[in-house]
């Protein structure tokens, strides 16, 4: 990790919404805060066996979640990740379970939720983290098949997961909380200019959740999309990046930020998009909070200038 990634905050970039601009966890998003407690809850995290998803699972266990369910495509990796999470859990009663599920397969998602129903498992928090990073090609050179494959994972699978989550048969499990791990490529198209299918499909997913939030109260299902920032995951290393490529975020920053997003403190962000580097105390108060309350389009997918 670079030096910057090990600091709680660094000088804020000119384009950020808040100062400070965090690169590592800080007290306001600590899972040990009673206000962020996930005690007794079951949390489902797609793509939770490594990287950001694993950090999110760790943070929810630190927040006293009763059960973490992580999904992954590889049985061994998913099983081992769940075992490691359980062994390291700060909460003695907390446990993690690994379930093989390829979200690119609609039948696999149906089977996952049917399994929950059969065993009487109700999910309280859904974290949408699984993603398909499209090839580095212009849209018209990628081919319709490859672009649609990205839509299948990044949009169709997300909608299917949300529908099954929302329509669970277990009664009385409200409010539900949904955290969407998004990307700042949804509003800065130059960031992933070499992978336009990625930005396209992640934008579509964020917009879909934004529209769902229009018709769903946060008291029923709270929805927040977050940008996890730059984290040096194994996938990033596989793409050729190393510790010197960026001032990387600590993976614990998006991990703990996801817990905050699933708490009542984040209810005012229902249907909106936020960066995990932004300071939550600053967002909760002052001019930023005032604009959120007055502007229904602020921090949402849309057209600038209108």
Residue ranges and their predicted role:
Residues 49-50, 74:
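Conserved glycine-rich cofactor-binding loop
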Residues 129-136:
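Conserved NAD(P)H cofactor-binding loop of Rossmann-fold oxidoreductase domains
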């Amino acid at each position: 990790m670079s030096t910057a990634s090990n600091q709680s905050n660094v000088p804020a970039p000119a384009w950020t919404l808040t100062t400070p601009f965090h690169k590592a966890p800080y007290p306001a998003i600590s899972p040990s805060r009673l206000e962020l407690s996930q005690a007794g809850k079951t949390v489902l995290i797609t793509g939770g066996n490594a990287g950001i998803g694993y950090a999110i699972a760790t943070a929810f266990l630190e927040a006293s979640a009763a059960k973490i369910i992580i999904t992954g495509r590889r049985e061994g990796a998913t099983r081992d990740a769940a075992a490691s999470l359980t062994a390291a859990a700060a909460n003695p009663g907390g446990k993690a379970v690994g379930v093989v599920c390829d979200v690119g397969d609609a039948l696999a998602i149906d089977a996952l939720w049917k399994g929950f129903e059969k065993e009487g498992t109700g999910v309280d928090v859904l974290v949408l983290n699984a993603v398909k990073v499209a090839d580095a090609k212009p849209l018209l050179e990628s081919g319709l098949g490859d672009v649609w494959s990205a839509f299948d994972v990044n949009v169709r699978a997300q909608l299917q997961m949300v529908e099954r989550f929302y329509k669970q048969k277990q009664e009385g499990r409200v409010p539900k909380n949904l955290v969407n791990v998004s990307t700042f490529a949804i509003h800065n198209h130059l960031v992933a200019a070499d992978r336009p299918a990625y930005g396209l499909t992640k934008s579509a997913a964020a917009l879909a959740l934004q529209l769902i939030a229009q018709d769903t109260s946060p008291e029923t299902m709270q929805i927040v999309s977050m940008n996890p920032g730059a984290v040096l995951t194994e996938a990033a290393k596989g793409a050729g990046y190393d510790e010197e490529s960026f001032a990387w975020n600590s993976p614990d920053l998006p991990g703990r930020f996801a817990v905050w997003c699933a708490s009542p403190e984040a209810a005012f962000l229902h249907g909106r998009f936020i960066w995990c580097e932004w300071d939550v105390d600053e967002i909760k108060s002052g001019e930023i909070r005032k604009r959120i309350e007055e502007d229904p389009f602020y921090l949402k997918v849309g057209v600038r200038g209108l």
